[in-house]
UniProtKB/Swiss-Prot annotation:
Record organism: Paraburkholderia xenovorans (strain LB400)
Acidic residues compositional bias, start-end: 188-203
Location relative to the cell: Cytoplasm
Transmembrane regions listed in the UniProt entry: none
Source organism superkingdom: Bacteria
Gene Ontology biological process terms in this record: assembly of large subunit precursor of preribosome
Primary location recorded for the protein, binned into one broad class: cytoplasm
A Pfam family that the UniProt record links to this protein: DarP
Basic and acidic residues bias spans: 21-31
Protein name: Dual-action ribosomal maturation protein DarP
UniProt keyword annotations, A-Z: Cytoplasm, Ribosome biogenesis, RNA-binding, rRNA-binding
């Protein structure tokens, strides 16, 4: 007696393809991309005015973003932000990529500026707390005027003790900020420079 073998059909796990034979993106992928474009549009709306001018936006997107910034009504703004997202989805891939690059560049510069401001604030606190900190600072920033630094530190301490407006406290911040210059040469670098100078004279 022969036994019949039951053949079960197995659903294909391969991704769907369109009429041209290309893989269709999954629904979850499409949803994720829509969300990312919506976030990109929201980031553009939140940019400062001067930064927004540097963004490579097509005219339609530029108009939509500026309108969203102008609207103050909560519900009206929400609808406009959604519209910005729809405009974002109509952009070419290269247009979206250019916007991401410009935003990444802006955010990178912004982070660097913030980090520098924090460094200036920490340096000011060190200078006000420890006299030896000025010597270290001058060694690392040879372009800074040490006499001006001492005067600002002394006056900033005095105005703090007397509860006066922080005029010299702010001026000390600017002095530190403007002190950047070429780093001081190490001993070996100085020796190399002297050797080069001697060689030039002997030539």
């Amino acid at each position: 007696m022969t036994r019949k073998t039951r053949i079960q059909t197995i659903e294909s796990a391969e991704p769907e393809v369109d009429e041209n034979g290309y893989d269709r993106p999954s629904k979850s992928q499409l949803k994720r991309e829509m969300h990312e474009l919506q976030e990109l549009g929201a980031a553009l709306i939140a940019l400062p005015k001067d930064a927004l001018k540097r963004m490579p936006m097509p005219e339609k997107l530029d108009d939509a973003v500026r309108e969203a910034r102008r609207i103050t009504d909560h519900e009206g703004k929400r609808r406009q932000v959604q519209y910005v997202g729809r405009v974002m989805r109509s952009l070419l891939d290269e247009e979206t990529a250019a916007l991401r690059t410009a935003l990444d560049t802006y955010n990178g510069v912004n982070k660097a500026e913030t980090a520098k401001l924090h460094w200036i604030e920490r340096t000011r606190e060190k200078l006000l707390a420890d006299d030896a900190a000025l010597t270290d600072f001058i060694r690392q920033h040879p372009n800074a005027d040490p006499q001006q630094g001492r005067t600002l530190i002394r006056n900033a301490r005095k105005e703090a003790q007397q509860s006066k407006p922080p005029r010299y406290f702010r001026e000390l911040f600017q002095w530190i900020k403007n002190a950047d210059g070429p780093p001081a040469q190490t001993d070996s670098e100085a020796d190399d420079a002297q050797d080069d100078e001697d060689d030039d004279r002997d030539a």
